[in-house]
């Protein structure tokens, strides 16, 4: 078929001849009419315009008037100017951006994966805002020296975020201190602790500012303020003086102060619930802070509604003020909630790590970041960027109603310690984050829960935060010690209760419980119940209740027949210890693997179990997981392990695309992946990955894996290309001959890859056209990338072969 086009005025005429000679005869006639030389393609008067040489010749000229200068029809010149203007105008109408129509355009779905811009990895947050705690003043007050009107006793404030819609707590506790210095002096100085206060720890012993973050902000997120005081007695009797008015308030101030002063000297270790308040935060789901909202009144704490579930119900009831009838304690809260400024300096992470810029000698009080408990869903989590290794313990409930051993146990406190062995001479580890409020080290060896007066089955809401060691073993455990705390000061002072382990006489031990931190090699992170024993003998971790009155291990007497009396909950926020059983199993196995056949088979089993790993955990640990899998490729000796590894990689890449998290894959390739260079191994990632992919392109391979690979082949090709470049850098081959940069086996693998890849595309052209199109684009980018590294003659051969496999109908 032979043809050409003629443009006359505003129309284009296409002429097609059956033979070359016929087309040339037509051109001869047209050239004779227009005065154009057929052999040179130029007008006989050397004016502009002419023919474009090629298979399809096109008659071209600058404009209509130019083409008529040598015409044998000069009368046409009369309207030439007007015709040119009309043509120029019409050419601008309805023009298409033809380059955007190219099938290689990054705007077309499926092609953007290779050219997507990737941000430098950084720590990601939700909506962040600053909370500054300035003051808390109760109407019941007293003057101290020159200071006018301060609280009569110290108060301890805890702030946390609660999501009423999701019915859960979404942040850790922030303990802030708003006590005046003269009030804080009512508390005794702590005893010396080995490895005690650091040089700059006093800077954040009295924190007042915190940075909160909310990934999914909405109007039902509340900031909840809990107020505690030093243990004195029942909540009702302790709040009564604060709710008086007039002369009764003034008369009661002195008496209340004297009682508080005595309590601070003897019971300062223990706190009791006192009151609470709430504040809504957001106007809408976009995270706009509601500046017009204020704190609710301070409500007396109900002793029967201490749990987080009960608190969430209270918060919901507070929103409907006409139905909420809780007693109000007159007080004023001064706490500002503002957007986080961009120039905030001297802040610290939730693990007390300084954030640059940070001046440790500055007198500016640091701002503490509060850990958000991000939902474990793919769209909310990100790969870990900042070290964290914290363990949260929540004692929930203790049931001493039916135990007969400690009949006087009423005001029960739970002391929590973290220990690395169960010998009597061992000391607890100093790794529990200390609560603020007095000059203490950042970490302590033990902490206590709040005490509920005269209650044998208390409910707790305390959060104990522990900084975990990097390496854990089976002897690491939590030790819970239960104390009955006497609130009767006269009896306590006269030594009515025995002093144990140097504790003040106000305490009496009433039981022990312990919880090993690891179960089947993994950290326990769930809600569970454990029994309580009367004592903790040497080697108590080996003791457990066997049922039917039998005891296993050291002789221990269990309360209430060994029933699980203590209910607790735990949570892990760690970049070191995973929470998915399958990911954790792989990590532990690879750490212990020795390359033996038995070890290789175990590796294969661990890889197969990764198919059911949680997507959110995969995203959090993605760089580490992918590094481990690519490492397995170059150290394994079994083809089965190679096949399982590639299958898992394809599965992960496909899953992350399905949940719209391909961004973490882009980030990994560009910023995290580094070619693994191991001494004693001549294998490379690019060669082993290419060989592994061949197994899933051959006839009879798993069609699901094959289809997933074709759709997301860009990631594997990008890893191969980057590994090829890394190989040249590490081996100093950047300046070497292209033909000798890579082994002959790798060239053969590339050839086989192409030979197997094309039939997969052709097979899907009709029924899975989208998959075929995406695979075609991925291969095009890969071949383009090969020009940078390998013999370009070989690359052109690849292109030639690729094109030869397609018929004209296939390219439509």
Predicted regions and their residues:
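Glycine-centered tight beta-turn/hairpin loop motif at sheet-sheet or coil-to-beta transitions
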Residues: 8-10, 330
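Canonical phosphoinositide-binding patch of PH/PH-like domains
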Residues: 11-18
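Hydrophobic residues within the alpha-helices of tandem HEAT/HEAT-like
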Residues: 482-486, 648-654, 716-724, 779-783, ...
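Buried hydrophobic core positions in alpha-solenoid tandem helical repeats
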Residues: 629-630, 761, 783, 799-802, ...
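Short, intrinsically disordered, charge-balanced linker/junction segments flanking boundaries
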Residues: 1, 44-45, 799-811
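Short, conserved beta-strand segments of beta-strand-rich sandwich/propeller modules, principally
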Residues: 3, 222-224, 477-479
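Eukaryotic regulatory linkers and domain-edge "caps" enriched in S/T/P and acidic residues that sit
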Residues: 18-23, 27-465, 469-472, 485-642, ...
């Amino acid at each position: 078929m032979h043809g050409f086009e003629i443009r006359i005025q505003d129309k284009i005429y296409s002429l097609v001849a059956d033979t070359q000679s016929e087309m040339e005869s037509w051109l001869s006639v047209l050239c004779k009419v227009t005065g154009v030389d057929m052999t040179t393609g130029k007008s006989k008067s050397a004016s502009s315009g002419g023919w474009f040489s090629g298979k399809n010749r096109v008659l071209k000229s600058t404009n209509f008037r130019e083409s008529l200068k040598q015409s044998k029809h000069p009368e046409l010149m009369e309207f030439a100017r007007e015709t040119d203007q009309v043509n120029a105008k019409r050419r601008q109408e309805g023009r298409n951006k033809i380059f955007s129509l190219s099938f290689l355009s990054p705007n077309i779905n499926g092609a953007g994966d290779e050219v997507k811009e990737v941000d430098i990895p950084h720590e990601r947050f939700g909506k962040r805002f600053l909370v500054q705690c300035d003051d808390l003043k109760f109407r019941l007050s007293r003057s101290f020296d020159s200071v006018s009107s301060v609280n009569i006793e110290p108060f301890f404030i805890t702030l946390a975020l609660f999501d009423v819609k999701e019915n859960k707590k979404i942040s850790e506790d922030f303990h802030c201190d708003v006590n005046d210095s003269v009030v804080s002096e009512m508390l005794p100085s702590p005893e010396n602790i080995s490895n005690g206060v650091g040089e700059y720890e006093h800077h954040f012993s009295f924190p007042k500012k915190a940075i909160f973050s909310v990934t999914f902000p909405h109007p039902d997120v509340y900031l909840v303020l809990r107020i505690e005081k030093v243990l004195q007695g029942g909540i009702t009797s302790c709040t009564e003086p604060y709710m008086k008015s007039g002369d009764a308030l003034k008369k009661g101030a002195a008496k209340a102060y004297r009682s508080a002063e005595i309590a601070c000297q003897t019971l300062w270790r223990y706190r009791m619930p006192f009151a609470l308040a709430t504040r809504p935060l957001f106007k809408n789901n976009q995270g706009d802070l509601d500046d017009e909202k204020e704190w609710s009144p301070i409500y007396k704490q109900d002793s029967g509604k201490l749990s987080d579930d009960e608190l969430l119900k209270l918060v919901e009831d507070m929103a409907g003020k006409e139905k909420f009838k809780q007693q109000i304690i007159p007080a004023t809260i001064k706490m500002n909630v503002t957007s986080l400024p961009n120039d905030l300096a001297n802040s610290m992470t939730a693990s007390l790590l300084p954030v640059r810029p940070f001046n440790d000698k500055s007198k500016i009080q640091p701002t503490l970041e509060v850990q958000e408990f991000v939902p474990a869903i793919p769209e909310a989590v990100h790969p870990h960027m900042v070290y964290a290794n914290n363990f949260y313990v929540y004692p929930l409930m203790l049931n001493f109603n039916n135990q007969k051993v400690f009949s006087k146990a009423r005001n029960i406190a739970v002391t929590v310690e973290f220990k690395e062995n169960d010998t009597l001479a061992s000391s607890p580890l100093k790794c529990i984050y200390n609560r603020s409020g007095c000059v203490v080290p950042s970490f302590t060896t033990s902490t206590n829960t709040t005490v509920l007066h005269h209650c044998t089955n208390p409910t707790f809401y305390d959060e104990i935060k522990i900084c975990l060691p990097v390496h854990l073993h089976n002897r690491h455990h939590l030790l819970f010690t239960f104390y009955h705390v006497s609130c009767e000061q006269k009896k306590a002072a006269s030594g009515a209760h025995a002093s144990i382990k140097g504790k003040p006489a106000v305490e009496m031990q009433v039981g022990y419980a312990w919880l090993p931190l690891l179960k089947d090699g993994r950290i326990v992170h769930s809600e569970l119940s454990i029994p309580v024993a009367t004592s903790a003998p040497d080697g108590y971790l080996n003791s457990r209740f066997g049922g039917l009155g039998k005891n296993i291990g050291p002789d221990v007497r269990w309360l209430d027949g060994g029933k699980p009396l203590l209910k607790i909950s735990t949570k892990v926020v760690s970049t070191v210890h995973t929470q998915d059983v399958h990911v954790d199993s792989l990590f532990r196995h690879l750490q212990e693997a020795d390359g033996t056949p038995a070890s290789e088979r175990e590796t294969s089993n661990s890889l197969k179990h990764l198919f059911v790993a949680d997507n959110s955990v995969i995203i959090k640990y993605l760089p580490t997981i992918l590094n481990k899998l690519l490492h397995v490729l170059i150290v394994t000796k079994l083809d089965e392990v190679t096949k399982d590894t590639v299958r898992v990689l394809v599965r992960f890449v496909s899953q992350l695309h399905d949940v719209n998290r391909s961004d973490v894959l882009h980030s990994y390739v560009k910023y995290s992946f580094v070619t693994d260079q191991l001494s004693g191994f001549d294998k490379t990632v690019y060669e082993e990955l290419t060989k592994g992919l061949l197994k899933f392109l051959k006839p009879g391979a798993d069609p699901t894996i094959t289809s997933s690979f074709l759709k997301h082949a860009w990631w594997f090709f990008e890893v191969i290309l980057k590994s090829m470049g890394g190989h040249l850098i590490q081996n100093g081959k950047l300046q070497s001959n292209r033909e000798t940069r890579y082994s002959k086996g790798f060239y053969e693998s590339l050839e086989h890859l192409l030979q197997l890849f094309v039939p997969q595309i052709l097979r899907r052209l009709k029924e899975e056209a989208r998959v075929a199109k995406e695979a075609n684009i991925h291969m095009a980018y890969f071949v383009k990338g090969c020009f940078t590294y390998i013999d370009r003659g070989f690359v052109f051969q690849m292109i030639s072969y690729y094109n030869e496999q397609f018929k004209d109908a296939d390219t439509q």
